[in-house]
Amino acid sequence: RVFEGLAPRLEEVVIIDGIDGRRFTAGDVIDHVKRLAGGLRAAGHVPQQPIALMAPNSPEYCIIFHAVAWAGGTITTLNPTYTAHEIRHQLHDSGAGLLITDPATLAVAKEALEELPEVQLCVIGSADDCLSLSALYGPAQEQQCPVDLDRHSVVLPYSSGTTGLPKGVCLSHRNLSINTDQTAQGAESRAGETAAAFLPFFHIYGMTVMMNLHLACGGVLVTMPRFDLELFLRICQDHRARRMWIVPPVALALAKHPLVDAYDLSALEQVFSGAAPMGSALSDAVASRLNCAMLQGYGMTELAPVSHITPLSTPRSGASGLALPNTRCRIVSPETGEDLPPGEEGELWIKGPQ
């Protein structure tokens, strides 16, 4: 689905590194993805074992993610702030045979692999004592490796582990591509939108709504390795951003921080918040200060992740929105499993192609 979105705009810039300014056209991204996919298959890294990726947002993150998908592999994404113990758990649980990391997280990655000698280490950039990402490139794999798009797990993100250790969630090509299109329709995305991409790509929210949606639907990503309010505001100003994709702590900064007034955000039409609930008071404060619609959605990792979005045409403060196309919901009694009448609290059951 991402390649379908990139193919018609080979000469257009689609990813900008927000730190060093490097620019990648759609043609550049496709070329990098195909050559890395070819190298991964030639080296035997796919499809035998999942490939683990632990790095902050960057153009390379997008390339690695889609190269593994193009090669017919499975990628498991790790939080770059993990401890060595947490890294070991996910690598062992997922069965990953290769860990690709960033120079900033190389030390903790090495510590984690001291007890997992069977896992090979690769670094984005270069390091004297381990494989560099550039060394994995090979002849371009021109055609996507055929897999069952409905059943093959292309990504294995891990849940937050609120009831125990984090658990891997198997998501197929179809799950991701359908949710990308569902979200684009629900959010009324337009070609040419630029996103200040600080939402971490390792998390399903940033993965689908930020990375995949913008690459597939004609947008531009300006990658940020972490949230920085000044950089975020400058990107939104300089690129005349129509929309912000955020989380509630960022909404608080947008509502209260004096730095916001120093930037021209007049092109902004809407702010979309997800990943955690936000009350109507904060929602209204953001909408009032930025003079735009403040929208929310709902989802979870198992839903790839979006199931509900508040429509721009009918914004409702503090609400999570309406179900996306082809998504069915029930509110049932957790004790009996029977549907509850309007106004009653119960358990939300969701079913859909995502």
Annotate each language-model stretch with its function.
Residues 1-15:
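A short N-terminal helical cap/helix-turn-helix that marks the beginning
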Residues 10-11, 128, 140-158, 165, ...:
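Conserved pre-ATP/AMP-binding loop-to-beta segment of ANL
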Residues 14-58, 62-66, 83-88, 173:
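Conserved AMP-binding/adenylate-forming core of the ANL superfamily
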Residues 23-27, 154-178, 310:
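Conserved AMP-binding A3 loop
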Residues 98, 104-150, 160, 257:
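ANL superfamily adenylate-forming
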Residues 177-194, 202-243, 253-257:
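Conserved AMP-binding/adenylation subdomain of ANL enzymes
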Residues 241-246, 255-316, 328:
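Gly/Ser/Thr-rich phosphate-binding loop
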Residues 330-350:
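Conserved beta-loop-beta connector loops within the AMP-binding
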